[in-house]
Amino acid sequence: MTPVVALVGRPNVGKSTLFNRLTRSRDALVADFPGLTRDRKYGQAVVDDMNFIVVDTGGIDGSEEGIEVKMAEQSLQAIDESDVVLFMVDARAGVTSADIGIANHLRRQKKKVFLVANKTDGLDGDVHCADFYSLALGEVYQIAASHGRGVTSLLEKALAPFFEELTGKSAEEEAADEDAAYWAAFEGTDVTEEDESDEELTGEDRYADLPIKFAIIGRPNVGKSTLTNRMLGEDRVIVYDLPGTTRDSIYIPLERDDQHYIVIDTAGVRKKKKIYETVEKFSVVKTLQAIEDANVVLLLIDAREGVSDQDLSLLGFTLHSGRSIVIAVNKWDGLDQDTKEKIKEDLERRLGFVDFARVHFISALHGSGVGNLFDSIQEAYRSATKRISTSMLTRIMNMAAEDHQPPLVRGRRVKLKYAHAGGYNPPRIIIHGNQVKDLPESYKRYLINYYRKSLKIMGTPIHIEFQEGDNPFEGRRNKLTQTQIRKRRRMMSFVKKG
């Protein structure tokens, strides 16, 4: 499960600065859900290839209503959802009454808390941070979020237990394995017999026997539970809302037409009598973790309410995660033709940035159109895991360049040399050439659409990266021949005479 890191502290200690640095975004609003998480921002971050979700809580100032009230209103839920809490303080301001109140609350929580002193740039950190040990939260980690100093080492230590749980090895053991694999490859030997067996499974065979994991996501009360029950079969009356943490998604195996699936249910499958509840608890963290863990994301939209900002936020997070997408518009039955046309126009206008995703109009309650969702889920998964040879990718690239030449850059034509696969799920294509990094965004979109049409890729984003062609002679001096040496001597003699 993707770990969750919460940033907690009073106002102006640098939480948003650290959040923006971790999410590599200036506005950092990767997922902002009005009315549900009004005072919390959710983002996606990566440190040393370790993915995690970071939550920026509202500043807690105990001067007005009391520290406990503010904590309950803004940050208590974020702390409950998190695996790690980074309690941020201002090294320049020293210990405040608000810091003491927050520390008292955090000590009562069964969470791993790291005390982080920010704004230590230009200061004697040890002197200015000494007072923070009085908060009794252990070691004080010194960082400068605005410059990034100390951030990586802090996150590496905070996420180390989750890294070990994920790989079964410590970071040191993982690094040793990487070194062994590198030298084994360099010497032309294999590290383990298992590696040989893995190499035999190439292409789509590697994924053929694996179940397709798809997550059903959407705003509260759009029909996620109804759709899940419809897919599983109405006679299946099982309570999947097990006791325990509220942010754990439920993984339900499903088989249809000899294809195995795993449904990641973020709402919980409930008994029939509870399906029609008017209020459904919506956990942002649970939804974001389900997106991270899925192969395909099925976004459910309420036809009667249209596309909301929350839907767009969920789509944005899904695209950022590189997941395949299928869109289902629920509650389509009972609408008149004029209303349906208006809804379709609105969908086309607001969802233009995901025009590669299949859109289905369904009724989860009555089952109409639900069966077609499986075809699109399979199509999206196969598109995302499709193996394409270098020769095919290069040939399509050349065809695209012939149909529409790359533009001139500083008076010179951009030259595309060759293309190869850089990864899958989602497909990543690396194009090599001269001045390719100067290509305008319009031509990049043209290449993506050309590849999508040529390879019949639907339901998954395509990422194209450009690499400049290296000059093999750059930095090297040509070795002169004897004739060239004699010619240079003659020229030098004429210069001296002159």
Swiss-Prot record:
InterPro entries attached to this UniProt entry: G_ENGA, GTP-bd, GTPase_Der, KH_dom-like, KH_dom-like_a/b, P-loop_NTPase, Small_GTP-bd
Pfam family, one: KH_dom-like
Ligand binding (GTP 2): 218-225, 265-269, 330-333
SUPFAM superfamilies named among the record's database cross-references: P-loop containing nucleoside triphosphate hydrolases
Residue span(s) of domain KH-like: 386-470
Binding site for GTP 1: 9-16, 56-60, 118-121
UniProt keyword annotations, A-Z: GTP-binding, Nucleotide-binding, Repeat, Ribosome biogenesis
GO biological process terms, semicolon-separated: ribosome biogenesis
Chain ranges of the EngA-type G domain: 3-166, 212-385
Molecular function GO terms recorded: GTP binding; ribosome binding
The UniProt record lists the keyword Chloroplast: no
SUBUNIT field: Associates with the 50S ribosomal subunit.
Family: Belongs to the TRAFAC class TrmE-Era-EngA-EngB-Septin-like GTPase superfamily. EngA (Der) GTPase family.
Family matches, as NCBIfam families: GTPase_EngA, small_GTP
Task performed by this protein: GTPase that plays an essential role in the late steps of ribosome biogenesis.
Protein's recorded name: GTPase Der
Organism per entry: Tolumonas auensis (strain DSM 9187 / NBRC 110442 / TA 4)
Classification lineage: Bacteria, Pseudomonadati, Pseudomonadota, Gammaproteobacteria, Aeromonadales
Gene expressing this chain: der
